[in-house]
Amino acid sequence: MADEAPARSGFRGGFGSRGGRGGRGRGRGRWARGRGKEDSKEWVPVTKLGRLVREGKIKSLEEIYLYSLPIKEFEIIDFFLGSSLKDEVLKIMPVQKQTRAGQRTRFKAFVAIGDNNGHIGLGVKCSKEVATAIRGAIILAKLSVVPVRRGYWGNKIGKPHTVPCKVTGKCGSVSVRLIPAPRGTGIVSAPVPKKLLTMAGIEDCYTSARGSTGTLGNFAKATYAAIAKTYAYLTPDLWKEMPLGSTPYQAYSDFLSKPTPRLHADA
């Protein structure tokens, strides 16, 4: 009995020593089969923005961000950044809720996604199964993809390599401050912000963190909030007024007014 205690205490091996390899294998197989069906399924947009993207009316993500159009379908991100997107699971942690029948355990997944070239997203999902939590977190991360503004530390020579100014993000007690750094410095930070900054395409940056940085979820969310603020500051080079044209919804109103063909489920 003493030898079996460690196997029963872990949550990754199923219930008891019998559910170790078999339970995980079945779960992984179901997830793999499900992903294959989703990948082979053709995308049928359900929003106006999705229809415009599918028909090629909108050429890039920046055009969507320019008019602050909300993205409700993760396939839009796949359409523009599918081949360059990389996702990484930051952490999977068990969370419990006390019920009448006892404790209900679920798994919480933190996933970061980016293309190493100016786009970053962060997703958090809780589910009964690890595979379902990761899959849901990836979808939420794609829906939360934001543009990253990069700048220079000194002279504007070469490509932008660091954050344009000092920015701060906060979540819970954790506060993260990003500071521009000279070219060649690298990313001076803890492992969690370093992953997010690298996936965002920032090459050089100093960081300063305060609070309970051991709480990985809040640490990642604070870093994501700081990166997202790079486009929130109105620097002098953005003072010039740029007249905006009509939104894509207005420009292609005739196309959007046409009825969409409905799908009929096969009997």
UniProtKB/Swiss-Prot annotation:
Residues 11-20 have a biased composition (Gly residues). Residues 1-37 are annotated as: Disordered. One of its GO terms (molecular function) is structural constituent of ribosome. Residues 21-34 have a biased composition (Basic residues). One of its GO terms (biological process) is translation. One of its GO terms (cellular component) is cytoplasm. Residues 85-148 form the S5 DRBM domain. It comes from the Eukaryota. The modification Phosphoserine is found at residue 60. Keywords: Developmental protein, Differentiation, Oogenesis, Phosphoprotein, Ribonucleoprotein, Ribosomal protein. PROSITE patterns: RIBOSOMAL_S5, S5_DSRBD. InterPro entries: Ribosomal_Su5_D2-typ_SF (IPR020568), Ribosomal_uS5 (IPR000851), Ribosomal_uS5_C (IPR005324), Ribosomal_uS5_euk/arc (IPR005711), Ribosomal_uS5_N (IPR013810), Ribosomal_uS5_N_CS (IPR018192), Ribsml_uS5_D2-typ_fold_subgr (IPR014721). Component of the ribosome, a large ribonucleoprotein complex responsible for the synthesis of proteins in the cell. The small ribosomal subunit (SSU) binds messenger RNAs (mRNAs) and translates the encoded message by selecting cognate aminoacyl-transfer RNA (tRNA) molecules. The large subunit (LSU) contains the ribosomal catalytic site termed the peptidyl transferase center (PTC), which catalyzes the formation of peptide bonds, thereby polymerizing the amino acids delivered by tRNAs into a polypeptide chain. Belongs to the universal ribosomal protein uS5 family. This is Small ribosomal subunit protein uS5. It comes from Drosophila melanogaster.
